Amino acid sequence: MEEQVPMTAPGRWRALTTAALALLVSACATAPHDGASSAAADASRSAVQPALGVAAAPKVLPPAALPERAPDALDPLRPDTRIDLDSRGARTDLWARVRNGMAMPDLDDELVRKHERWYAGRPDYVQRMTERGARYLFYIVEEVDRRGMPMELALLPFIESAFNPQAVSSAKAAGMWQFMPATGRHFELQQNLFRDDRRNVLASTQAALDYLTRLFNMFGDWHLALAAYNWGEGNVQRAIKRNLAAGKPADYASLRMPDETRNYVPKLQAVKNIVLDPQAFGLTLIVLENHPYFVAVPIERDIDVALVSQLAGLPPEQFAQLNPQFNKPVILAAGTPQLLLPYDNANTFVKNLQRHPGPLASWTAWTVPRNLDPAA
């Protein structure tokens, strides 16, 4: 993404049902802050196979009780919204939901064909990319849906980073959505010694959708908005002015732009076409069920990353996949009010944290008072 100095703008909001769960850590933490038709889901399953290492979300039970069925889920960002995780709608194929929400005009040119062939010739790469994206895609789809945006945008991290939240470009763009440092700061993505929120799954997704909403409001065209996301809004504005001054069309296909930007929307169109009909390209997509992969667990005390992994029974590399923003081995609760954990590990973490007898952090940050004499 080209470095910009944007201002956020709210997207369109609409009602939805959502399926995330907030776990309340008694005495150790404070509270933080729909689906496609079954027919479409059944039709889509003929082109998918089970994901490797991506299990269906288990029920999360309160530590003090073991009822026969799990309680309704609670969204950590919208705690008044609940959904029955046992309902049929909660298990609808997420790919069907993505397909049903696609609304951008199609590109149909040789560049699209070129990228279709590239992906079709690399089934192992597509498999790895979709398995990685399985951790994050439900949350992104929920946010795109909530804002009433075209569902093609949920596929954009495939193009930006292959759904790798640790990705860093040669130009220093970072995270799943590839924010440049200055652009990230303008969207309040903190970048300091302890964390880089350009890699934060929740914060970077919110910032990216804010930015894309602003760009669409500026250009009135999703292809131009995407070009601006990649190349920079100022560059797109100047390219439009040049074409208009020369009496030429000012649509995406008619503008003069760098090769990377020229290929940007065709790449997204190729991924869209593959998601719509993977069998046509000799590909098979993994099954993605329409429910969350992770849960947000609130914390109020500093805690070591290694201790979180230990208490959650989660390998450190898996913790880092959901919480890639941390730069140091300690998590400062003042700047990080919640952690992301898979459902079953979140429940384990809550129980073990309540029983943990020792300190949570082996070291922490300390601000030197201005009046302290270092030589004293």
Features from the language model and the residues they span:
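Bacterial N-terminal signal peptides that target proteins for export
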Residues: 3-17
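Extracellular LysM carbohydrate-binding repeats and other cell-envelope/extracellular binding modules
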Residues: 322-356
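Primarily a LysM-type cell-wall glycan-binding module
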Residues: 286-312, 316, 359-376
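Bacterial N-terminal signal peptides
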Residues: 17-26
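Extracytoplasmic/secreted proteins, especially bacterial periplasmic and envelope-associated proteins
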Residues: 110, 114, 128, 132-135, ...
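Substrate-binding clefts and substrate-entry loops adjacent to catalytic sites
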Residues: 114-128, 163-170, 178-220, 240-255
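An acidic, Gly/Ser/Thr/Pro-rich helix-cap/linker signature
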Residues: 28-148
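Short, functionally critical alpha-helical segments immediately adjacent to catalytic or ligand/cofactor-binding
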Residues: 149-166, 225-231, 320-323
